[in-house]
């Protein structure tokens, strides 16, 4: 885009951890992006979308399943990026993977369009409600897969 320098693009890509794979590309930032970005993994596309968002300095970001369909290594990069992005503006995140939202200021647990409970990760765990049940199930599933 006009008005955005290569230096600013590099800085933002580093900020969201996209530099981890961009530096390995044959043409770096000048790499051709094929239709639907199919020459990149789902996680790489997600990191690029974060960079595109951050470069425009939004006050509100809406993220829907930011860590869906990605490998564990890329999930860690995305989670690190999300943590950094919290300082950019307000984030509204939709997530089934609870590890994605456990550092959120406020978590709202919905079921069939109704709010079941809300609070921080620690507050919701202490309530032993639906969030606690979901977290326990996901945590045990992840432990068994390791």
Model features per residue range: what roles?
Residues 18, 126-146:
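C-terminal boundary and immediately downstream tail of ABC-type ATPase nucleotide-binding domains
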Residues 6, 22, 121, 131-132:
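Internal amphipathic alpha-helical segments of the cytochrome P450 catalytic fold
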Residues 23-27, 142-143:
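Short, flexible cytosolic linker that couples an ABC transmembrane/permease module to its adjacent nucleotide-binding
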Residues 24, 110, 137:
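Conserved residues at the C-terminal ends of beta-strands
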Residues 7-24:
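Conserved ABC ATPase "signature" region
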